Amino acid sequence: MDKIKPSEVSDILLQQLNSIGSEQNFEEVGTVLTVNDGVARIYGLRNAEANELLEFENGTMAIVMNLEENNVGCVLLGSTSGIKEGMSVKRTKRIASIRVNDNMLGRVINPIGQAIDGLGEINLSESYEMPLDRKAPGVIYRQPVKQPLQTGIKAVDSMIPIGRGQRELIIGDRQTGKTAIAVDTIINQKSFYEQGKPVYCIYVAIGQKASTVAALVQTLKEHGAMPYTIVVAATASDPAAMQYYAPFAGAAIGEYFRDRGEHALVVYDDLSKQAVAYREVSLILRRPSGREAYPGDVFYLHSRLLERAAKINEQQEVAEQMNDLPECLKGKVKGGGSLTALPIIETQAGDVSAYIPTNVISITDGQIYLESDLFNQGFRPAINVGISVSRVGGSAQIKSMKKVAGTLKIDQAQYRELEAFSKFSSDMDAVTAMTLDRGRKNNQLLIQSQYSPMPVGEQVAVLYCGTNGLFAPVPVEKIRECQDLFLEVMRSQYPDVIKTLGEGKIDDSITATIEKVIADVAGQYK
């Protein structure tokens, strides 16, 4: 029998001790105290942070919202059915975020980035982890809004222009065409996408029926708008937490494009439902309620979301220093990008002075107000020009449009006043009669059918005729027919004129061409 040397034993023991890793993987784990209505209270997570992601043992994720003395209140991003009292919950040490890359374009996702369109998983191998909640860019990193965002809607582009980086509220009662304006704007970006100057669109559906979202996606597909669009959907059947976080997911995706020097448009449809979801979550978390039972910080909820829309400074060295930049974007930031927001608010019986509508009006850079009465009279889009406004104004218009449509808003407001008085008087002077006639005809010109956005060059040509009274020989009921004939001639015989107008140039030779064509077309109606 061989003798074992003591020195060999000590060497073997020493080798084994050295091979043991000293690193230990600690996980902070808590237990579920209570769970109800999409909210769970967890005991034991003493170091949990606000907005941190938590993972339950069955794989369900949750986000920390309340930090209390003895427990943590969190909202569940899934069903509560598999979660029981005493179940273990662990910290992920990650702030709530969404993974984003270009493969998301053309897809329908939920607020945590999972595909819900049945087209398989999205390849997120090379993706950016964008935080859902993030501070808005500071004043130094912004620039004044000066580039137009063309909606293709005559009434908007001429009288309530929207610029890249602006927040323009769309407000009105149900069934007045709010979503239609947003969808038309998305469809109108197709020409820019084809020219290689895309405006990426994010449509956020909050608390809508799944069938409504499916119909909208189908509409976007039919008009070729999905290749540059991402739809984020938290439907009515999803938990309140999902509806609450959906707009933040949309903003995070928009920031991914904005901070890389690209242009993005995000539509929140609609923020009234997000406020209701936030109220629901807050009341279950036992937060003190305020006016209309909304929590006291409901204004801050919308302001911090909408302030994330911005036109970023074009100077590269300034843009790179942007505040609260996610780690994944450091060194990849490009200046000059923009994120435009079109929040939608639903009013009850035209009451614009309610709590949430007044909050959002005070945050945004203007509003497009839609009226049921105008909609029912057949004026669509049913925009009330009198109280709709864009606080960016002419700086978000091309020069030709600014020149042609400069007085259109005032003219239409005056026409509305005169029309109200004309109902009471039988005789009127020639000037008043002419103003009323021109107003009625311009009203007809501004009517536009859904899903048919008009290129800006064609808009300028039509509005030049309208504001200069060149449709005078045409009866009011034939105005739209005459407009279509006029545009047909312009497209076939003078495409260069329309192209030049679209580039913002207008001179005497161009106006002479327009006047000649409209005289020939309008002459047929004498």
Give the location of each predicted region.
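P-loop NTPase nucleotide-binding/switch module
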Residues: 87-89, 96, 100-103, 116-166, ...
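Conserved catalytic/coupling modules of large nucleotide/cofactor-utilizing molecular machines
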Residues: 256, 273, 280-526
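Walker A/P-loop NTP-binding active-site region of P-loop NTPases
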Residues: 164-215, 270
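Nucleotide-state-sensitive switch-loop elements of NTP-binding domains
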Residues: 199, 209-253, 283-295, 302-307, ...
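Loop/turn-to-beta-strand initiation segments
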Residues: 198-200, 227-230, 261-265, 336-341
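Acidic-enriched and Gly/Ser
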Residues: 2-16, 22-25, 31-149
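Phosphate-binding/switch loop-helix module in NTP-utilizing enzymes
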Residues: 242-278, 330-331
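Phosphate-interacting basic helix/loop segments used at nucleotide- and nucleic-acid interfaces
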Residues: 12-20, 92, 151-156, 250, ...
